[in-house]
């Protein structure tokens, strides 16, 4: 069953409590029945390494007016690999247009542009990503009720208040987070 989730948000449901994905919001960069899915967690900010640390490791010299973007734990796969999810107003070599509004770039060009104060209007960097085999995500959504699907908004994807993104995504689909529970009890 093709759900067409590219460019949407996966919002962790209570079924994922006490797992790696608890209270995560994932922007789906790619999803197809044949290839599975790939996405980036956009609400788990990393304190280390910070953007300056990454610039130093990569030999990129920032020059004023350097842009500040958040660095998130993108997911449990390929932690050493960096991805920049950004507005579609910038594209470089290897950039992938996700949905006409958002672009994914995994090359150093974008970091050099950001360090120089240029590049896309909005961006978030992720180290690592989340991935699902063909059919796996559909099963987690339809059978396991592990994820809610929400529209991606710039405020949630690129916003800097990472602690509020999960709640914002639930509110966007008319769920009251206070009413959610990971278990059902008896009266």
Swiss-Prot record:
Domain of life: Bacteria
Gene Ontology cellular component terms for the protein in this record: cytosol
Coiled coil: none
PANTHER family (alphabetical): UNCHARACTERIZED PROTEIN YQGE, UPF0301 PROTEIN YQGE
Protein family membership: Belongs to the UPF0301 (AlgH) family.
Protein name as catalogued: UPF0301 protein GOX1459
Organism per entry: Gluconobacter oxydans (strain 621H) (Gluconobacter suboxydans)
């Amino acid at each position: 069953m093709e759900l067409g989730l590219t460019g949407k948000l996966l919002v962790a449901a209570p079924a994922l409590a006490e797992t790696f994905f608890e209270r995560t919001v994932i922007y789906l960069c790619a999803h197809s029945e044949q290839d599975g899915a790939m996405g980036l967690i956009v609400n788990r900010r990393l304190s280390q390494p910070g953007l300056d640390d990454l610039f130093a490791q990569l030999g990129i010299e920032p020059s004023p007016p350097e842009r500040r973007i958040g660095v998130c734990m993108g997911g449990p796969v390929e932690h050493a690999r960096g991805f920049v999810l950004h507005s579609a107003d910038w594209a470089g070599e290897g950039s992938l247009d996700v949905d006409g509004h958002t672009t994914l770039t995994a090359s150093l060009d974008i970091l050099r542009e950001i360090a120089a104060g240029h590049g896309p209007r909005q961006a978030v960097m992720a180290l690592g990503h989340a991935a699902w085999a063909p059919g796996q995500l559909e099963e987690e959504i339809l059978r396991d009720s592990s994820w809610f699907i929400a529209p991606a908004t710039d405020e949630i994807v690129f916003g800097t208040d990472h602690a509020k993104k999960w709640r914002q995504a639930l509110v966007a689909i008319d769920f009251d987070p206070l009413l959610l529970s990971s278990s059902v009890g008896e009266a």
